[in-house]
Curated annotation (Swiss-Prot):
It is a multi-pass membrane protein. Pfam families: SecD_SecF_C. Its main location: membrane. It comes from the Archaea. Involved in protein export. One of its GO terms (cellular component) is plasma membrane. Disulfide bonds: none annotated. InterPro entries: SecD/SecF_arch_bac (IPR022813), SecD_SecF_C (IPR048634), SecF_arc (IPR024921). This is Protein-export membrane protein SecF. The keyword Cell membrane applies. Part of the protein translocation apparatus. Forms a complex with SecD. It comes from Methanothermobacter thermautotrophicus (strain ATCC 29096 / DSM 1053 / JCM 10044 / NBRC 100330 / Delta H) (Methanobacterium thermoautotrophicum). Belongs to the SecD/SecF family. SecF subfamily.
C-alpha cells in the first residue's frame, strides 16, 4: 500500500506540468521523422528485386564470415546469406551483380552453381496500395474512436499517439538499417492495432470511470498497459535473440521482432506520456 501511495504521489508531481509529458515523445517523433527523410529506408529484395545465387562451399565458413567477405569484395552491404546446409549455400543480392565479379569474390571459398535475377514480390503499385490501406486504416480507426468517445480531443489524442508510435518505429528501422520488407510492413500493421489498444485503455479509464482521482485512474490503466507492453517486449526480445544467435538464417523473424520491440517501446512513451499529457490538459481546460 505504501509503495502504491508513493507512485501516486510521483504521478501527481509529474502531472502537475503536462507539457513535458507531451514534449518528450513529440521531440522523439520529430527526430524519427528527420531520420526517415534524410537517412531513408533500405528496401529488401521483396520490394526492389535483386539476384539469388546457389553456391557450393570449398571450405568451412560461417554465415557472418561469408557475408562479410562478399560485402568487402563487392563493395555493397545489400547481401544476405539465406541458408547454409552443409556445403550448399543460398545468397541473396539486393542488386543484380555481375556474376564474374561474384565468382572472383568467392574464389577459394565457394563456387557458383546457379545465378539468377529475381523480380520484386510486390510491385510499386502494390506498395502504393498498401500505403493507401494504412491511411484508410487510420481514417476508419479515427471514426471508430470518435464514435466511442463522442469527443474530438480524446479521439485525436489516440490517433496522434498511434501515428507517433508508427513514425518512431519507422525511424528506428532507418537508424538500425532494418529493411522495408513484407515482414516489416506486417509488423507495422500489428503495431497500429497494439498502439490503439493501449491508448483506448487509458482514455476509457480516465474519461469513462468516475471512481477515484484522475491520477488514480491513470495509474490503474498504467499498471495494466505497461504490464502488457513489458510482456510483449520480453517475448519479442526472446524471439530476436533466438533468431540472431541460434537461427541466423531466419532473418525475417529477427526483422519482425526488432520492429515490434522499437514500436512497443515507443508505445510506452506515446501512450503514457503524450496521450496522458493531452488528456490531463483536456480535463483541466474542460473543468
Amino acid at each position: 500500500m505504501g509503495e502504491t501511495l508513493k507512485v501516486i504521489v510521483l504521478i501527481d508531481r509529474i502531472l502537475k506540468s503536462y507539457r513535458p509529458l507531451i514534449a518528450i515523445p513529440a521531440a522523439i517523433t520529430v527526430i524519427a521523422l528527420l531520420l526517415v527523410v534524410f537517412n531513408g529506408l533500405n528496401e529488401s529484395v521483396d520490394l526492389k528485386g535483386g539476384a539469388l545465387a546457389e553456391l557450393t562451399l570449398e571450405k568451412s565458413v560461417t554465415q557472418a564470415e561469408l557475408e562479410s567477405l562478399l560485402r568487402e569484395k563487392l563493395g555493397t552491404g545489400d547481401i544476405k546469406v539465406l541458408s547454409i546446409r552443409g556445403e550448399r549455400v543460398t545468397v541473396q543480392f539486393g542488386t543484380d551483380m555481375d556474376v564474374v565479379k561474384v565468382s572472383e569474390a568467392l574464389r577459394g571459398t565457394a563456387t557458383i552453381n546457379s545465378y539468377k535475377a529475381v523480380g520484386p514480390v510486390l510491385s510499386k503499385q502494390a506498395m502504393n496500395q498498401i500505403y493507401w490501406a494504412i491511411g484508410f486504416a487510420f481514417l476508419f480507426m479515427s471514426v471508430t474512436v470518435f464514435i466511442i468517445f463522442r469527443d474530438p480531443v480524446p479521439s485525436l489524442a489516440v490517433i496522434l499517439a498511434a501515428a507517433s508510435d508508427i513514425i518512431i518505429a519507422v525511424g528506428g528501422m532507418s537508424l538500425f538499417g532494418i529493411p522495408l520488407s513484407l515482414a516489416s510492413v506486417g509488423a507495422i500493421l500489428m503495431l497500429i492495432g497494439y498502439s490503439v489498444d493501449t491508448d483506448i485503455l487509458l482514455t476509457t479509464r480516465v474519461l469513462k470511470r468516475r471512481k477515484g482521482t484522475i491520477n488514480e485512474r491513470a495509474l490503474g490503466a498504467m499498471k495494466t498497459g505497461v504490464t502488457m507492453s513489458i510482456a510483449a517486449i520480453a517475448s519479442m526480445a526472446a524471439l530476436y535473440l533466438v533468431t540472431v544467435f541460434v537461427m541466423p538464417e531466419a532473418r525475417v523473424l529477427s526483422d519482425i521482432a526488432a520492429v515490434l520491440i522499437i514500436g512497443l517501446l515507443a508505445d510506452i512513451l506515446t501512450t503514457w506520456l503524450m496521450n496522458l499529457g493531452i488528456l490531463r490538459w483536456y480535463l483541466e481546460v474542460r473543468s
